[in-house]
Design a protein with these regions (language model features):
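SDR active-site lid
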Residues: 161-201
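Residue(s) in the substrate-gating loop at a strand-loop-helix junction
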Residues: 128
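Substrate-binding pocket helix/loop in short-chain dehydrogenase/reductase
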Residues: 84-85, 92-94
Length: 201
């Protein structure tokens, strides 16, 4: 992987940070994108919001102006919502899809043409074990990751003839700040006999 240019979204914490640092240790030039103002020491940080196409476009243009190529893209940016479906607003569900699914879509729409024209590239989309094994009271999170899996399989077949490989990684629970940062909707826990709070503890 030496001398390759890698881009990691959500690269300032958790899995994204660990991935970005591992790529750097492997010899890659790494750009990590997040909404935070400050990034990780030793990595190139660009403040960007994956839910905004213009923000993603500007970030990719900045990387291309500096490096002239992108060899690896890791779509890691995401968050979680927990709660019963009947007490989770449609707006909350949409915001989850905006980041976990359409954030990935926005990045890929900018990077795929670059990799296709170069004739090589690797795209890694962060999914979850919650995609094949949906988790009660994390219904919408599970749905976003199932969408990531379906999208990944289709995109892999689209891009294979151009030398671009696409895969999804499905981690289980990992000791990061992700669970603590999850947006928790506890309404209706009494109706569900405490199952909501127990399932997301």
């Amino acid at each position: 992987m030496s001398n390759k240019v890698a881009v990691v979204t959500g690269g300032t914490s958790g899995i994204g940070r660990a991935t970005a640092l591992a790529l750097k240790d492997a010899g890659c030039t790494v750009y990590e994108l997040s909404r935070r103002v400050q990034g990780v020491e030793g990595l190139h940080h660009i403040s960007a919001d994956v839910t905004r196409e213009e923000s993603v476009r500007a970030a990719v243009e900045q990387i291309m102006a500096r490096e002239g190529r992108i060899d690896i893209l890791v779509n890691n940016a995401g968050f979680g919502i927990s709660g019963a479906v009947e007490f989770t607003s449609t707006e909350d569900a949409k915001s989850l899809f905006d980041v976990n699914f359409f954030g990935m879509v926005n990045m890929n729409r900018q990077v795929v043409p670059i990799m296709r024209e170069a004739g090589h590239g690797r795209i890694v989309n962060l999914s979850s074990v919650a995609a094949p094994v949906p988790i009660p009271f994390q219904t919408y999170y599970s749905a976003t990751k199932a969408a990531v899996n379906a999208y990944t399989m289709a995109l892999a077949n689209e891009l294979r003839p151009f030398g671009v490989t696409v895969c999804a990684v499905m981690p289980g629970d990992i000791h990061t700040g992700f669970t603590a940062a999850r947006r928790k909707i506890g309404e209706g826990d009494d109706i569900y006999q405490g199952r909501i709070s127990r399932s997301v503890a």
